[in-house]
């Protein structure tokens, strides 16, 4: 990744950074909840972004 990024690329990276987090604890505690973990979690070394 270049040090000088275009604004579009930077926006995409920021979005992916926000998406890449675990499920909040209060979501797990909801009644009748089946969500245990974030299935779309991405590791920076294992799976690369198609940018």
Swiss-Prot record:
GO CC, one annotated term: cytosolic large ribosomal subunit
One Gene Ontology biological process: cytoplasmic translation
GO molecular function: structural constituent of ribosome
The keyword Ribosomal protein belongs to this UniProt entry's keyword annotation: yes
Gene3D superfamilies (alphabetical): Ribosomal protein L39e
Record's keyword terms, sorted: Ribonucleoprotein, Ribosomal protein
Family assignment from sequence similarity: Belongs to the eukaryotic ribosomal protein eL39 family.
HAMAP family (alphabetical): Ribosomal_eL39
Protein name: Large ribosomal subunit protein eL39
Gene behind this protein: RpL39
């Amino acid at each position: 990744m270049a040090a000088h990024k275009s604004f579009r690329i930077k926006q995409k990276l920021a979005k992916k950074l926000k998406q890449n987090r675990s499920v909040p604890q209060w979501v797990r505690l909801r009644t009748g909840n089946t969500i245990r973990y974030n299935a779309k979690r991405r590791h920076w070394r294992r799976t690369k972004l198609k940018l």
